[in-house]
Amino acid sequence: MWEGKLGNNIKETLMEPYEGLPFDEPKYDLYHLQPSIFKGFARSSRNIIVFNKDTLGQGFRLIKNLWARPQVTALITGEDEDVMNFYFDENKDLLLRSISENERVEKIRRMTKSLNDDPQLKDRFGINITFPDAYSTVKDTTNFVWI
């Protein structure tokens, strides 16, 4: 499936480049794992798509926090590659929105773990700004600060 029409559709959809960059950089990194390898640590990824070849329970399901937190898992079941490709196409906008929101929430969580609490910007410029402690001041003049 990974080298066929379904795999190409997945790669084309999820590895679409960011707009506006001077070079192509895919929105998401993809890792294809065989079912025998998909256990333990592999299940702790934030965003997972599982394809099941089966005639029962066909369709698309989106599950939050199935094996880890935060996590979005898409379960796509179909009797063959064409049916799974159909379910993927029918639901890819929902899947992309869910993954994007999951990534946004995780980035915010990570950024707010260690915030810069320097009151200098509030004292000097009268603004209150929140940014990660990992950011540093590049240039600091009388009326300008570049972080």
Give short role names for the model-derived ranges.
Residues 1-147:
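N-terminal targeting sequences that direct proteins away from the cytosol to non-cytosolic compartments
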